[in-house]
Amino acid sequence: ATIVWKMEGGGYADCLMVCTVAAIISYIPIGIISAKIGRKKSILLGIILLGACFGVAGIFNAYHPIMNVFFAIIGFAWASIGVNSLPMVVEMCSAADVGKYTGYYYTFSMSAQVITPILSGFLLENVSYRTLFPYSVAFCVLAFITMSQVKHGDSKPAQKKSMLENFDVED
């Protein structure tokens, strides 16, 4: 941020704060939206938004307040992935295998969180600081391709009720 966007002090932390606050605000609405359109579509939408916003952010040569809009969208997009990923994993397995599949999910998720700073750090040091956003876009493309191949684990929409059943109340 200091080199590419000429930001001084702790101003670059504001970008992460905007993402985080947007994600926190988004968690419950995303859960509601995902129940209507499905987890897979919500995740794919999140990946598309992430990739698009990373691509746009990579174009800027200096920080501009409009970037906060993109960072807010990134927070929303990240939340749409996070809210739906583990439930999809759990939905794909039997009750006896929940622990095993949760272990797989966290092993790969945490491995990515360990490996990407090493890979991106190598690019930042040996190529350019401007590689961070293209690197992110590339992995969004890979995530989209991978997620588009998932066939199970989506939420099952509630069956439409007959007009009479809409007046029924639970005991």
PLM region spans:
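C-terminal ends and interior cores of transmembrane alpha-helices
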Residues: 49-62
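Multi-pass alpha-helical transporter architecture, strongest
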Residues: 135-169
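Short amphipathic helix-loop junctions that connect adjacent transmembrane helices
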Residues: 1-11
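A membrane-interface helix-boundary motif in multi-pass transporters
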Residues: 122-140
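Loop-to-transmembrane helix entry/capping segments in MFS-fold secondary transporters
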Residues: 9-10, 93-105
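Helix-to-loop junctions at the C-terminal end of transmembrane segments
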Residues: 25-39, 124
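Intracellular juxtamembrane helix-capping segments at the cytosolic ends
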Residues: 80-94
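Hydrophobic core of transmembrane alpha-helices in multi-pass small-molecule transporters
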Residues: 65-80
